[in-house]
Amino acid sequence: MNEAIEKRISHRCFSKEPVRASDVLQIKKWTAEVNEESGLDIEYLADGSEAFNGIKKSYGMFSNVRSMLVMKGFSDDETLDVKIGYYGEDLVLKMTQLNLGTCWVGGTYDSSSFSVPDGEALVCVIVFGNIRKTIKDVLIRAVIRSKNRKSIEERTVADAKLPEEVINGMEAVRLAPSAVNRQAPTLRYAHGQISMDGDASFKFNLVDLGIAMRHFEIGAGAGNFELKNGGLWTK
């Protein structure tokens, strides 16, 4: 998974070649396992392109969007956004290992295109597909990869020197996707305890928190977070 973290960047333009049937079956299997474990209702769509027809906003134009995961769950679950980020990013990294391109999409789509059962909430979608490899796409990816990333010091509050495994975890957090590049989740190290929290005033900060928690666990090579704002990390 560490290699997938290093490799992953956001892709908004895909080739017209459909995702291989064997990869689709694997993604469906992973999604079912995640739903069983988490209580989420993540839905695979072979063609959700209708939601992106005519969409061109601040994140740039999407092209050849078809396959996606619709990220939803029970609306009365106070930890829904954190869970969506955590389990969704686990799926993103697994799809990266399949050499597929992925992108978290928070608002640049027509939400009315999706079916959401009563009692559930649509949080976001993850689009994915085969990576388009034009010169323009290569240049765009170079710009994305070079985006300014906050230092570990800017994203931690600590009362002592950070252990090596925590530093490794935070290096992985620095490579996590973040809504409008806010990089908001903060790690706190106090009295030997580790927790992570995010400012809930912005809609997608708690999704980012779940994403960051999963990256930290992989980078640290051990432990699990409580999946909530301010959740503790235990080994």
Annotate each predicted stretch with a short phrase.
Residues 1-235:
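Acidic, surface-exposed loops and disordered segments
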